Amino acid sequence: ASAAFYLHAMVGRQSLYLWDNATYYNLQVRLESNFADGVFTGVGSTIYKTWFNDYAPLVINLLAEPFFMFTPRTANTFALLCALLIPSLVYYSAWLLLTVLRRKFQPKAPVLFTALSMAFVLLLPLLHIALYRGMPDLLGVAFAFMLLALGVGYDFSQPTPARLVSLAAFTGMLMLTRRSYMFTVVAFFLLYGVWALARAVRARQVQTVLRFGRFAAASLVCVGVPLLPMFWRIAKADYSDRYATYQTGGFLAELANQRVYLGWLVFVIMLIGILYGLYNAKARALSLIHI
């Protein structure tokens, strides 16, 4: 249904795409041009932009290139490609997360739980607004869902190398998709780490604490060190002038903006779900994860 909507919306009109669409479209064209000059030029340019540019082609553009190369290479076809490719990854990762949650919490009506949750994801206005305008950085939502799916119920009490490697890999891809997703990474691992360490200390599981520490150290070496120039540039940059136009008025004003984008219905549904989940002891953990 979503694919049909995007296909009708973008093929049946002529649009002028601005902001992120133009940025990523230019990155896509330059990516091809750089690799046309040689493999080393393409790889070097991609690494340089990843380290020192706010928008990097390493995840989104490399993912889109195997499909983009067979199109007329216009901004409209790039937007259409993103609107058809990215939702499939977001919906698939959401389905995987819901599958994990079903196994973990065993709801009384698992089919209804999955159907309503997927419907909520499919109908989320911000998802459609971003892709309707040809903004591909929504891809990070798929990686965020995968992080949640990998973290649910895992407390480092057992060695699972594949899970830990996947956690580190999806963390890196999420940060590279868009710089602002770093806030998601920090919040996720802060809460996740506190939860895992608290459980380990409470149960006096020394090996669990050591396993968590080794994972944190290995992740910093494998993900943090290669991206250190990017972190250093972000730490030195002053984004106040750039984002002052979009984010004004503080936290309450930002909530008001989200209400306008999401609409009253979605806002009320989310509020009711959160309050009921916090009230119901059996659903409290699930509600905290969604928050």
Model-flagged regions — what are they?
Residues 126-139:
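Short acidic/glycine- and proline-prone juxtamembrane loop motifs at membrane-interface regions
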Residues 104-108, 145-164, 174:
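Membrane-interface transmembrane helices that cradle and orient dolichyl/undecaprenyl
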Residues 289-291:
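Conserved small/polar residues in nucleotide/adenosyl-binding loops
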Residues 118-119, 163-179, 190, 221, ...:
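Membrane-interface alpha helices of multi-pass inner-membrane proteins
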Residues 182, 192-194, 198-199, 211-249, ...:
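Membrane-lumen/periplasm interface segments of specific transmembrane helices
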Residues 10-22, 35-59, 73, 80, ...:
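Membrane-proximal lumenal/periplasmic loop motifs of glycosylation machinery
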Residues 74-105, 146:
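Transmembrane-helix motifs of polytopic, lipid-linked glycan transferases
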Residues 1-18, 121-125, 219-233:
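Transmembrane signal-anchor helices characteristic of membrane glycosylation enzymes that use polyprenol
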